[in-house]
Amino acid sequence: MKKKFNLRNFIDEQYKISFSYIKGSKNFIYSTIGIFFVFSLVGFFLPIPESIATQIINYFKELVSKTAGLSLPEMILFLFNNNSISGFMGLFFGAVFGIFPVLSSIANGFVLGFVSNTSVHQDGIFSLWRLFPHGIFELPAIFISFGLGIKLSTFILVKDKWKTFQKFFINSLSVYIFVILPLLVIAAIIEGTLIYLGA
């Protein structure tokens, strides 16, 4: 007799698989965190060419123009779409030698450092506390995505490449759906609300 599908048991099992895979991938995630924070320090302390600074500022100006006039639900959806796409690409494009998640960690860390430096110069050191709520859920989700993206690329190093890739891919997909996306939903709600209220 065919066993009846139980949604709750399925979800519980997926969470167990997801957290077990994250735990087994912690060194890759820690590496991503390390890359991110090293380049955030670079962005904060080292002067950068004016052309790069202008590009970063223009990027944020473009984001502001895109979100101007959005309602709170629209703002939340906009942020969630951006972050979920970034997380997806960082994870699954990592299959190509881990290049995309590494470069994304470098770029995101550098931009955070630059923005933090600009904020401190304009509003003082305590202005950094305003940035904290924006990243409390988003950054862990992105670190997990990028870390698993780097791990996904290591299938090329083992003997049974295709089987290993399938295993990594399926586990990564489970983590993306059951861990990363929920974190990004919470992050979008918090960040969207803060932006909407002008915090």
Residue ranges: model-predicted function:
Residues 119-135, 188-199:
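Interfacial helix-loop-helix junctions of multi-pass membrane proteins
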Residues 66-93:
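Interfacial helix-start motif at the membrane-water boundary
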